[in-house]
Amino acid sequence: MGRIISPDALILVAVMTQLRDLEIARLFGWYRIPLKTAPKVIAVDYLAFYQTGSFGADKWRIQYIAQVKGHELTTRAELLQDQPDHPRVNEEYYKVQIGSLQELLPPIPAGKWRRITFFYTTGEYLQDAETVNDLIVHSEDRQILWTALRERLDKEQTYGIGDQPEVELEDEVLAALLGIQGQ
């Protein structure tokens, strides 16, 4: 797939740490996010999967995206029933239902980046990205992105999130809320 996606699509760049997680996404159509480390808004249009060092030759890149179909809160025990003795078996996770994985051609390499946590971007940035750094929303667009995410949050009424006040935020605060570090 090329990178033809709506420019205003909301995208969450999510970390894929294991090949097994990629297979779960491909075969069963879901991705898990621990509630305690989840970003503020899960109700986005797409997930873009950043593949870590465990992916061998395909490491440190975004190779796949998937449309988000919905999400629910559950436990790790319910998601991964073959791991009843896992230390986090009773912790809560978002189970994000996704459509089929779409391969990005070419994939988006990390470049100098290696350690990535969740962050938001848009379809416009994804279309033009040559490296992961190109997905970082510029200062002048951060307020627009944050407003779109807040509107989505209000519409979806996600778990445990109350009304959010309308305030103008400084760029550093916006960057932190969007998962952007050191930019």
Listing of model-derived features with the role each one plays in the protein:
Residues 2-183:
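Structured alpha/beta reader/binder surfaces that contact nucleic acids or chromatin modification marks
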